[in-house]
Amino acid sequence: MLENIQAYLSKQGVKYIKPEKAGPHQEEMEDLKALGQAARKEMQTLAKLLEERLAPFKMDRVSNWANQAQICRPHFWCYYRAPEDSLDDVAMAIRLYGQSEKWGISVEVSFVERKKSDTTLAKQHKVLDLPIAPSLYYFAQENGVSHRVEGTEENRQMLKEAVRDGRVRKVLVKYDVPVTASEIMEELVEELVDGFYKLKPYYEEANQN
């Protein structure tokens, strides 16, 4: 299951060169593009299966297999929004994490950076207004670097203070679903749906006017 995604995770950071300009690496680049596209297609299939279980949420497009600089970007993501949500609202998303030998998909409450408005960060900070539930964790951005923070009441208070002081720019709430070789797609979708329901209160809190 999701074999192309797993294989493509090992290509993180690899530079893609158009095959016609790649000289002796032409075939290698053709294979790289084919793998990237196949991995993205698997992510699209998964995202669509998940969308069918999350009505009224609608999926956005899955991220590209390479960025504008043509660097491979295998940690695909896909955002989900309710019909009433604006583009600058806080949304729900799934995102790949890990390496080929140990990986999974996280569900998160976050927003699209390039679509944010003056109010988006303040909305995102409201995820800290609710107590953190077991099995969830925070992902905090400090000085441009994001790092995992264990989901405890003590850390919630610490992050609230850090946000107030301007030391932490944004805090996501996340839930990890490890992917195993023996798992089937239906089981994975079920676990991701469960993650969505665990995180939904934080999404609702963030978008409350």
Model-derived regions: residue spans:
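Acidic-enriched, low-complexity/disordered segments with a strong bias for Aspartate over Glutamate
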Residues: D31, D60, D85-D89, D118, ...
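Generic structural hydrophobic/aromatic packing signal, biased to beta-strands
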Residues: C78-Y80, I105-V109, Y138-F139, V171-Y175, ...
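Long, solvent-exposed, polar/charged low-complexity segments
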Residues: M1-L54, V149-N209
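Residue-level detector of functional hotspots within protein domains
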Residues: V62-N64, Y80, Q157-L159
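Aromatic- and glycine-enriched beta-alpha-beta binding-site module
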Residues: Q68-P131
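Short, surface-exposed, charge-dense and proline/glycine-enriched linear segments
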Residues: D60, A82-Y97, L136-E142, V168-V173
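Short, internal acidic amphipathic alpha-helical interface segments
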Residues: S110-R169
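Short N-terminal edge-element motif at the start of the domain
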Residues: Q44-P74
